Amino acid sequence: MSAKTKVSALDHAMQTAHTWVHDVAREFDTEDGEFAYRVLRAWLHTLRDRLTVQASAHFAAQLPDLIRGIFYAGWNPSTVPEMYDAEAYAARFAREANISLDDVGKAAAATTAAVLHHLPPPQMDKALDQLPREIRALLQAQR
C-alpha cells in the first residue's frame, strides 16, 4: 500500500489498518479485503457492545488509530453492556459480517487469531474474560 495522504501519521495509520484486514483475510485464505473488513468490524462491534464502557475503553486503548475508529463507529455507550446470549451474539455477528449463521464460530475464532497477531494474549484475555463463557468460547482462537 503506497502513501496517499502525504501525512506520515495518516499513511502509517492506513497501512496498519490494511495489515489488520489483510491478517483477517489470511486467516480465511482469501484475498477478499471487503469480506475481511466486514468480519473484523463485526468482531469489534459485537465484542464492544457486550463489554462495559470501562472495559471497552481499556480494550480500545490498545488498538491502532483507524481500528479504534472502527471499534467505536456507531457506539452508544448508554446502552452497553448489551446482555445477549451466545445465540443472539452469533445472529448479530452473522448479520453484521453478512455471513451465514453456520460460519460464525469459524469467523469469530479466526478473527480473534488475526487480532492476536497484534495484541498481546493477556490483553485479549482481559477483554474476553468479561464475556459469558458461551460467547467467549465462540471467540477464542486456538493458540
Regions found by a protein language model. Give the residues of each.
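Short, solvent-exposed interaction modules
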Residues: 67-121
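An amphipathic alpha-helix signature
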Residues: 21, 60, 86-90
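Short, charged, intrinsically disordered terminal tails
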Residues: 2-5, 142-143
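Short, low-complexity cationic-aromatic patches
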Residues: 29-41, 48-57, 99-110, 116-129
